[in-house]
Curated annotation (Swiss-Prot):
Keywords: Glycosidase, Hydrolase. Belongs to the glycosyl hydrolase 84 family. Gene3D superfamilies: Glycosidases, STAT, domain 1. This is Protein O-GlcNAcase. Optimum pH is 7.4-7.6.
Length: 447
């Protein structure tokens, strides 16, 4: 079963040393696969017809050798999907020329990507193919035949999640056709019911396997953050029970853009795949213990304490939730603020305020220690996120301290002695102000 990481995000690709580090983490987590497919490499997607030069090809063979030295399989991605004419002899020859160049270099394990494009068969192909899926399958089958059994192919479909299949994978004409025409030796990626799936359950995967006529390989975007540059995810893999594993042919995580942020994602994914009793909270505790040595301070023998590394994970937990501690503190404060004016003598208010003040102190301590760590890539990975966390919690504490002073009716916060110029502004915020959303992110107009 394929298990590991795909470098498949939109954004700046990883450096050579970052890829080596990620490979170390994959191997330590007991997984076996590294897939090279950064959108930032123009030879993968934007200029898929153009072969690598000697230096580019050497970089890939070096990565293959690095993966092999760790007992891992290395895949290279090609994404002809942006502008290929599936029936055009020149395009088909160009794709095979790319495959030949890679194969001659010993790079015979390929991923063919047809994701994030319109689900429309090009006009020029309609004389030969009766469906988009048939055209993609024909091109992919051609690649597999060309490899003559010397390599493996994984296919990423255009409909790669339940939402894109109209919520009903079994009823998707695209998936039906793909399942019936794509060579059974080619594996197929699937992200779950959503692009970023909060949960993946057995009934869903059974339906997917039925329509694809094979078990899918999960492309897990749970820790991906390329769709929201304001967030990073350092919590454990969640929302996936172990009973789904017999229904898949592999599990590949597509994690954060920032390589240094991905130790928890990789460590807990490996734990999920290996541990029959996997529990996210226990997995993240083990990940924190194993990750802490990377937080060594630049001077002396110390490191950021494990409780503060755990706080880092808690602050930047998962795409659908804050960490348990942060959730508890903010939930208690939200409840205490439901009254127009909190009573400074109310025990619930006092407890919520003290917990918030303590959270602020610990975030400040974490922020300061992170500026002093030796690993500057790790520092810069989290610096902007921690800066925002420190500023926002500081502002919240200042407001609650002001309320705790029992200000007179009609008083406004912040007063002139309060700093308030970090209020978020800009184009994105202006758009969001127009589109008023509820707590689930849904829009309502005129209600």
């Amino acid at each position: 079963m394929l298990t590991g990481v795909i470098e498949g995000f939109y954004g700046r690709d990883w450096r050579r040393d970052e890829r080596a580090t990620v490979m170390d983490w994959i191997a330590a987590a007991g997984m076996n696969t590294y897939i090279y497919g950064p959108k930032d490499d123009v030879h993968v997607r934007a200029r898929w017809r153009v072969p690598y030069d000697a230096a580019g090809l050497a970089r890939l063979t070096e990565l293959r050798d690095a993966a092999a030295a760790r007992g891992m399989v290395f895949y290279v991605s090609l994404a002809p999907c942006l502008d290929v004419t599936y029936s055009d002899p020149q395009d088909r020859a160009a794709l095979l020329a790319r495959v030949d160049q890679l194969a001659r270099a010993g790079l015979r394990n390929l991923v063919l990507l047809f994701d994030d494009i319109p689900s429309v068969l090009p006009e020029a192909d309609r004389h030969r193919f009766d469906s988009f899926a048939e055209a993609q399958a024909d091109l992919s089958n051609m690649v597999l035949r060309h490899l003559r059994g010397a390599g493996h192919v994984v296919f990423c479909p255009t409909e790669y999640c339940g939402r894109m299949a109209g919520g009903d994978p079994r009823g998707s004409a695209y998936l039906q056709r793909l399942g019936s025409t794509l060579d059974p030796a080619i594996d197929i990626f699937w992200t779950g019911p959503e692009i970023v799936s909060e949960e993946i359950v057995a009934a869903h995967l059974a339906a997917v396997g039925e329509v694809l006529r094979r078990r899918p390989v999960i492309w897990d975007n749970f820790h991906a953050n390329d769709y929201d540059i304001r967030r990073v995810f350092a919590g454990p893999l969640g929302g996936r029970s172990r009973d789904i594993l017999p229904l898949v042919a592999g599990w590949i995580t597509n994690p954060n853009n920032e390589a240094e942020a991905n130790f928890p994602a990789i460590h807990t994914t490996g734990a999920y795949l290996a541990d029959p009793d996997y529990a996210p909270e226990r997995a993240i505790a083990a990940a924190v213990a194993a990750w802490q040595p990377r937080f060594r301070l630049a001077f002396g023998d110390g490191a950021v304490p494990s409780d503060l590394v755990a706080l880092l994970c808690d602050l930047f937990w998962q795409p659908f939730a804050l960490g348990p501690e942060t959730t508890r503190i903010l939930s208690a404060l939200r409840a205490a603020l439901t009254v127009p004016r909190p009573d400074p003598s109310d025990p619930a208010w006092r407890a919520a305020l003290e917990d918030l003040r303590d959270l602020k102190r610990r975030i400040n301590k974490l922020f300061t220690l992170m500026t002093e760590i030796e690993n500057r890539d790790l520092f810069h990975t989290f610096h902007n996120y921690l800066w925002e966390a420190q500023e926002e919690v500081g502002h919240l504490v200042a407001y609650c301290d002001w309320l705790d002073e029992a200000p007179p009716p009609g008083a406004v916060f912040p007063a002139t002695d309060r700093i308030h110029n970090f209020y978020r502004r800009g184009f994105g915020v202006a758009v969001q102000d127009i589109l008023q959303r509820d707590r689930q992110g849904r829009y309502h107009h005129g209600v």
